[in-house]
Structure formats: C-alpha cells, structure tokens
From Swiss-Prot:
UniProtKB keywords: Coiled coil, Golgi apparatus, Membrane, Phosphoprotein, Transmembrane, Transmembrane helix
Encoding gene per record: VAMP4
Gene3D superfamilies on file: 1.20.5.110
Known partners and oligomeric status: Identified in a complex containing STX6, STX12, VAMP4 and VTI1A. Interacts with BAIAP3; this interaction is increased in the presence of calcium.
Protein's name according to its UniProt entry: Vesicle-associated membrane protein 4
C-alpha cells in the first residue's frame, strides 16, 4: 500500500529540511481548494447534482441487475439446449435402431409367409396326387 501523507508533521519529520519548506509544511493554512480535495465536495453546493448522480447510479444498478439476470437466463438456456441436443441424438439413434429392426422383422415375416405358402402348395399337391392315384386305381381294376 502506498504511504499515507500526514496532515500534521512532528519536528522529527522535518529535521534537515530547509526553513522555507518547514514553514510551508507546518503552517496551518488551509485554502478552499485544498479543503475540497481533502474532504470532498460539500453537500449544499452540489445537492441537485448529487440527486442526479444517485438517480443515474440507481439506473446503472438496475441495468446491472437486468444484465446479470439475462446472463443467468442465457446460461440456463444453453444448458437446456445441451440437454435437448442429447435427447435429440438419443432419439435419432433409437429411430435408426427401430428402422433396422423393423426391416429385419419384415424380411422374417415375408420368409415365414413364403414357407406357409410352400407348405400349403405341397399339401395341396399331395392331396391331388392321392386323389389321382385313387381314381387311376379304381379304373384299372
């Protein structure tokens, strides 16, 4: 931290200084300009301006609050978008798996239908062959 300047100096602080310096440092004169910088502006002179500053400061505080809320909302929205993207990717993967499984099942069902038709055709052919053999044997005897 920088050293703080003393308002009133002791004799030990000024030993070795020139008389003019000592007189300027130890004199207790305070003009208005020096007091302004040491104590700050006085209240009555800057009353209306001080109200304006407070008003502007309140507006700045409100803007800061709104910006912080907006940033929080953007962060939450980003998190929700990430979750939504993950769910969307999962749904896409599930849709692809469902499509592949449905194609496989369709093929299985088609082959099952073909097998049933082939068995029915074979049974019909055997029945027809039995009937023909019976008719032929009946006429031969």
């Amino acid at each position: 931290m920088p050293p703080k300047f003393k308002r009133h100096l002791n004799d030990d602080d000024v030993t070795g200084s020139v008389k003019s310096e000592r007189r300027n440092l130890l004199e207790d004169d305070s003009d208005e300009e020096e007091d302004f910088f040491l104590r700050g502006p006085s209240g009555p002179r800057f009353g209306p301006r001080n109200d304006k500053i407070k008003h502007v400061q309140n507006q700045v505080d409100e803007v800061i609050d709104v910006m912080q809320e907006n940033i929080t909302k953007v962060i939450e929205r980003g998190e929700r978008l990430d979750e939504l993207q993950d769910k969307s990717e999962s749904l896409s993967d599930n849709a692809t798996a469902f499509s592949n499984r449905s194609k496989q099942l369709r093929r299985q069902m088609w082959w099952r239908g073909c097998k049933i038709k082939a068995i029915m055709a074979l049974v019909a052919a055997i029945l027809l062959l039995v009937i023909i053999i019976l008719i032929v044997m009946k006429y031969r005897t």
